[in-house]
Curated annotation (Swiss-Prot):
Domain IF rod residues, every copy: 84-395
Chain residue ranges for the region called Linker 1: 120-136
Residue(s) at site: Stutter: 335
SUPFAM superfamilies found in the cross-reference section: Intermediate filament protein, coiled coil region (SSF64593)
A single MF term (Gene Ontology): structural molecule activity
Signal peptide: none
Linker 12: annotated segments: 229-252
Superkingdom of origin organism: Eukaryota
Any matching Pfam family: Filament
Additional comment: There are two types of cytoskeletal and microfibrillar keratin: I (acidic; 40-55 kDa) and II (neutral to basic; 56-70 kDa).
Protein name: Keratin, type I cytoskeletal 18
Length: 438
């Protein structure tokens, strides 16, 4: 908050003092005494000058002789003025007293003016010259701005770290989903491998069964061949030559042997061909499954390494985020302490400014009192000079006396201009000015 106090301006207005100033003259002849003068009041209250004993002219002055309650005072030309010499002497004494008082007050006024000027020179720059405070305020503004920038930078870094952590979390979740999918594929391939192994074992068992059956068939065939040969041999000994020519058993056996051998070879070839095709198919599938399994294992190891690196990076980002949050809390704490210190400094400066204003007002009031007293004394001196100068006319009116006693009533206008500025992040967001006139 910056506040400035405008310089004082003095407006002097002239008006009759009939309402604020009165000259009371009373007398009882022939007793004479010196006058006692009292100065009081400031500005509009004026000063009252009373003379307790002053020579008048018989009953023409009306006993009391109150100038404040009459509009005019008429001096009768037929009245006899006695003791004029004593009256003039009394007036001269009073005039000398007034002149001495005026000189004394002028000297006191000059001394007070010098003191006021010195006080203004000493205290004035501290009130109006805010260069020292502006330097401190500028440094504090720079510090606040730097702190705000650092705070914004830290907030941005925290946001970036949070976004990076979110990205890594998304990547980690995606990689985890891929890993789970690969694991499920590997489990499926393992089931396929198990099924393939079972099929291979079944085929091998079937091949063994077929081999045993082939051996059994060969053995039976040999047994049948041997039995047939024995039968043929036994039958050939008892052949009746006269019997009609029968079927050639050797040819039949050869035909049967050829048919059985062809059938056996065909079955053997079909079995071997089927076995080879199945074995080749299972070998191809096994190779493919092995390659897929190896690829899946490689991908799984890569995914594990990537997940491990992502977890390490995530932990580092978490630790960096925690450190940044700690730094942010420390910065906010320092910022709050600095703002509290600045608030205390501003309050102290405002208190000093209020004290300076109070001192200035008090000095101004003292100056006004002295100035009013001086001007009233000058007005009274002018009035007495007018009275001492004498009038040739027989009539002296109170209006003439009051017209000679017109003085300028001093009015002091104090204008206080208070400018309030609201700062946010080193920038002025609100500016208001209040002017107060006293």
């Amino acid at each position: 908050m910056y506040s400035a106090v405008s310089s004082r301006s003095t407006v002097v207005s002239s008006r009759p003092l009939s309402s604020s100033r009165s000259l009371v003259v009373s007398s009882s002849y022939p007793k004479m005494s010196t006058a006692s003068t009292t100065y009081s009041g400031v500005a509009s209250s004026g000063s009252r000058i009373s003379s307790t004993r002053y020579s008048t002219i018989g009953s023409a002055l009306g006993g009391a002789g109150g100038f404040g309650t009459r509009s005019s005072l008429t001096l009768s030309g037929n009245a006899v003025i006695s003791n004029e010499k004593e009256t003039m002497q009394d007036l001269n004494d009073r005039l000398s007293n007034y002149l001495e008082t005026v000189r004394r007050l002028e000297n006191a006024n000059q001394q007070l003016e010098i003191q006021i000027r010195e006080a203004m020179e000493k205290r004035g720059p501290s009130v109006r010259d805010y260069s020292n405070y502006e330097k401190i305020i500028k440094e504090l503004r720079d510090q606040i701005y730097d702190t705000t920038v650092d705070n914004a930078r830290l907030v941005l870094a925290i946001d970036n770290a949070r976004l990076a952590a979110d990205d890594f979390r998304v990547k980690w979740e995606a990689e985890l989903a891929i890993r789970q999918s690969v694991d499920s594929d590997i489990n499926g391939l393992r089931k396929v491998i198990d099924d393939t192994n079972l099929g291979r074992l079944q085929l091998e068992s079937e091949i063994e069964v077929l081999k045993e059956e082939l051996v059994f068939i060969k053995k039976n065939h040999e047994d049948e061949v041997i039995a047939l040969r024995n039968q043929v041999n036994s039958c050939g000994v008892q052949v009746d030559l006269d019997a009609p020519k029968g079927t050639d058993l050797a040819e039949i056996m050869a035909t049967l042997r050829a048919e059985y051998e062809a059938m056996i070879n065909k079955n053997k070839d079909d079995a071997e061909h089927w076995y080879q095709s199945k074995v080749e198919t299972f070998q191809v599938e096994t190779v493919q499954n092995t390659e897929a399994l190896q690829t899946a294992k490689t991908e799984l190891s890569d995914l594990r390494r990537r997940i491990q690196s992502l977890e390490i990076e995530l932990e580092s980002n978490r630790s960096m985020r925690a450190s940044l949050e700690d730094t942010l809390r420390d910065t906010e704490l320092r910022y709050a302490m600095e703002m509290e210190r600045l608030g205390a400094l501003v309050s102290r400066i405002e208190a000093e400014l209020a004290q300076v204003r109070t001192d200035m007002q008090r000095q101004a009031q003292d100056y006004e009192v002295l100035l009013n007293a001086k001007m009233k004394l000058e007005a009274e001196i002018a009035t007495y000079r007018h009275l001492l100068g004498g009038e040739d006319s027989d009539t002296l009116s109170l209006q003439d006396a009051l017209s000679a006693m017109k003085v300028s009533n001093v009015q002091t206008v104090q204008k206080i201009v208070v400018t309030t500025q609201k700062l946010v992040d080193g920038k002025v967001v609100e500016d208001s000015t209040v002017t107060e006139t006293k």
